[in-house]
Amino acid sequence: MTLSFTARWRDELPATYTALLPTPLKNARLIWYNDELAQQLAIPASLFDVTNGAGVWGGETLLPGMSPVAQVYSGHQFGVWAGQLGDGRGILLGEQLLADGSTLDWHLKGAGLTPYSRMGDGRAVLRSTIRESLASEAMHYLGIPTTRALSIVASDTPVQRETQETGAMLMRLAQSHMRFGHFEHFYYRREPEKVQQLADFAIRHYWPQWQDVPEKYALWFEEVAARTGRLIAEWQTVGFSHGVMNTDNMSILGLTIDYGPFGFLDDYDPGFIGNHSDHQGRYRFDNQPSVALWNLQRLAQTLTPFIEIDALNRALDRYQDALLTHYGQRMRQKLGFFTEQKDDNALLNELFSLMAREGSDYTRTFRMLSHTEQQSASSPLRDTFIDRTAFDAWFERYRARLRTEAVDDALRQQQMQRVNPAVVLRNWLAQRAIDAAEQGDMAELHRLHEVLRQPFTDRDDDYASRPPEWGKRLEVSCSS
């Protein structure tokens, strides 16, 4: 089967990019590809059979119909206007046309210098490409909207970061790479007609049902806000910290995008800061909902030329509603509640307080809770707490709450185990795969990808265990 590519972005938004070709790496080689995703997209297996070089995966060749561009956008970084940014090391190769008429961006990260590289070198390193591939696939299998990873190419090209590393490329796929920062770029250049063109493009291709509706722009922004609210709720319930929620890292489609200094909670710490460059804690775990709202407010400002203020404010309210509604639903599912009762939030907050005092493992606590039996006054979870008197008091209230549901243990446990993962991508697991890959051993990278495809399956190995102490202290930064 021949892959078909289109160039809608290039054809319809000429002011938003620079056309250019990728710059290949030295001695590039394909070290991993996503066989399951490739099969779903009907990508011929022969494309991955590269023995001399890295082919399209390393930017050495293009497929018919590809028209590479680097996109320009701007943004607020750590709450401060940063001006023009753009694809400093990534190139949108083309948009794959799928059978249902939708498209999928093929974006090559680490593809070399672009006009938007600023002081950078246009490269990604093996460490960061491995982390992003693992994180995006982990999030997908957790059911959280995200970009996807299709392939990783390693090389012998030296790249200087905190230390000297080697260059790599990641083929990232997404329904769209449209960001809040695209709109900010033209708003602050005082080109509101181009801001409106971006909105028209989004509506035409992603919300076509609103094209002929008079209030289409207001409806569109409401949906952007709602999707963002649901995304942040998913992050908070699974314990995911993005680490660098700049406006240029926010997706119009409500996708998790730009994995850098991310982390999943190990010990439950609501003030967890994943990014060691975030000295003020702006992007700490418990601040993500308010930062997302702040970012939406920045986006709303760019839309004032063609959306009424009242409509923008209604959309921002929609964010809060979507966030709280989705978060509440997810947390009730994690606790095994099928109905909503007035004391549920208090019960959850009591558990969080107990976990924070004890440094309980976030993922393992909820997974162990999912094995609770109503009639049993004891729980294996009890042994993980030092203050067992406090746990016993909470657990008795929890069991009493379970008894108000007309649901048997088997059904409740089944529901809980579908939303409480046994495995998340802990930083130490990613680092173990990276360390091996940097020595030329890709086995752990492939094995970890397989494990992350089944996050809701109980395991008795170290993929589902608490991290070693050194694993809790790993520092990650924007170069990650």
Curated annotation (Swiss-Prot):
- The positions flagged as active site in the entry are 248
- Per UniProt, what is one GO molecular function of this protein? AMPylase activity
EC identifiers of the protein: 2.7.7.-, 2.7.7.108
The residues listed in the UniProt record as binding Mg(2+), with positions renumbered to this chain, are 249, 258
Locate the residues binding ATP: 86, 88-89, 109, 121-122, 172, 179, 258
| Entry keyword set | ATP-binding, Magnesium, Manganese, Metal-binding, Nucleotide-binding, Nucleotidyltransferase, Transferase
Q: One matching Pfam family, short form? A: SelO
Q: What is this enzyme's catalytic activity, as reactions?
A: L-seryl-[protein] + ATP = 3-O-(5'-adenylyl)-L-seryl-[protein] + diphosphate; L-threonyl-[protein] + ATP = 3-O-(5'-adenylyl)-L-threonyl-[protein] + diphosphate; L-tyrosyl-[protein] + ATP = O-(5'-adenylyl)-L-tyrosyl-[protein] + diphosphate; L-histidyl-[protein] + UTP = N(tele)-(5'-uridylyl)-L-histidyl-[protein] + diphosphate
Q: Which domain of life is it from?
A: Bacteria
Q: Which cofactor does it need?
A: Mg(2+); Mn(2+)
Q: Which NCBIfam families match?
A: adnlytase_SelO, PRK00029.1
> What is this protein for, i.e. what is its function?
Nucleotidyltransferase involved in the post-translational modification of proteins. It can catalyze the addition of adenosine monophosphate (AMP) or uridine monophosphate (UMP) to a protein, resulting in modifications known as AMPylation and UMPylation.
Similarity comment: family membership? Belongs to the SELO family.
Instruction: State the HAMAP family in the record.
Output: YdiU_SelO
Q: What is this protein called?
A: Protein nucleotidyltransferase YdiU
Which organism was this protein described from? Salmonella schwarzengrund (strain CVM19633)
